[in-house]
Amino acid sequence: MSLATVDANYRSAVQRSTAFLETRMSDVGWLVWFNLLFFEMWVQNTFGFSYIDELAVLFLFFATVFKAVRMRKRAITIGSLEKRSLDLLFGVCIIGLAGNVISGVSVSPSNVAVDLFTCIKTPIAFICAYFIFYDNQRIESMVEVESKFLIVIMLVSAVMNLLFDFGMGWEGRYGLRSSFCFVLGHPTMVVAACAGLVVILARNRQDNFAWMSMAFVIIALTLRSKGFVFIATAAILLITYGRHEKFTFLHLLLIAVCGFYLGYDQFIYYFSTEGTARNELTKAAVRIANDFFPLGGGFATFGSAVTANVASYSPLYYQYGISNIWGLTPGQTMFLSDTFWPTVIGQFGWIGFAFYVGMIGSLFAFFYSRSSGAKLSVLLCFAYLFISSTSESAFFHPMSVFIAFSLGIAIAATRSAQVQNCEYEDK
């Protein structure tokens, strides 16, 4: 072990010890929010309360505003990339509202408001989490310790689930007794939760490699295709992503090949088989975007969670034959939110689709440019969201707020460490 490595490890240990000693009540509060977001599905299934992610976004937003007012320009400055992200997001909102007016599809104003907030909550959470955790090594130290504790508990439970039925299993696949859902209600929630933990741990991949590997085992035991693709993506990045932190076309090519190989069967089944929910939603979305060109149907008209209720069931589902598809019929809409891009295309049209893609690209560029030392966390975060967008509501999903929360913590801690390293060297 070189002297430089020993020195770096010593600095890291000193910083973490100091961080724990300097823990504030606000840090404990953010840790509570971290837990509420992680266990949101358990809270929803147990107590029927389903607004934790929305409340977390509002709390993040008002905390950011308060910090901006209190610190003025010393803590928060809006750069070109985040401004572009917000401008494009605002454009999507305008396009969606214009679509509601022009398309003439009958929807209630309250549903439009709910769907609009669903559209903006994750991008807002990303930006606010970045600014609110500015230079905060304390919260990251606390969250990293808890992340490792959660991984141990989940791994033991996942292995036991292979042998015994004790309420943490879902349907079996690939010859195994059952897939793992922990206390989160569905295996896909476990994949998202572990992805968030990996994003946090990835900023220090050398020290946390074993913990990340355990998280990948948990993801694998959910038996979900998106989980396998995410594991392959993470493995490629962990093996090939060097110290210079350069993401190249070769990385993208390797990830695309692995993703295609691992997800091909599921893609063919869901998107190329006539009569499946995802296939029919995709075809209907394209038709809607063409019929209502240049806009779409507007908010709360197609594919969004708010339209799953019988009272809010969209007239477009009858018009485009969606109401006759198993899993999409009135009162039986269990597969209605299993897509993301068809919802964007159907509700916002081709122009709105371009705006939304641009917004995501700007968000990624913003985080990647501001995350020296944590670029791997950024890549894993957006890779997971892109992978999940093929089979769930991705950026509209409640767990996406948890992912945004996790990335904000990972990046802010890295920046804090850089500042402290500079101070250490000056001494």
Predicted regions and their residues:
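A juxtamembrane structural motif centered on a specific transmembrane helix
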Residues: M1-V28, A68-A75, S372-K375, S406-K427
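N-terminal hydrophobic segments of proteins, predominantly signal-anchor/transmembrane helices
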Residues: E22-T46, V57-T118, L385
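Hydrophobic transmembrane alpha-helices and their immediate junctions
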Residues: R24, R205-Q206, E245-F247, V344-F386, ...
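Interfacial loop-to-transmembrane-helix boundary motif in multi-pass membrane proteins
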Residues: S26-G29, L81-V92, C119-I120, C128-V159
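Membrane helix-loop boundary segments at the extracytoplasmic
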Residues: N35-S50, T339, T343-F348, L376-S416
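Membrane-interfacial helix-loop-helix modules of multi-pass inner-membrane proteins that assemble, modify
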Residues: V101-S108, R138-V143, I151-H186, A311-S323
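Alpha-helical transmembrane segments of multi-pass inner-membrane proteins
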Residues: S141-G169, F182-Y241
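Long extracytoplasmic/lumenal interhelical loops at the membrane interface
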Residues: Y269-T276, K283, G298-F348
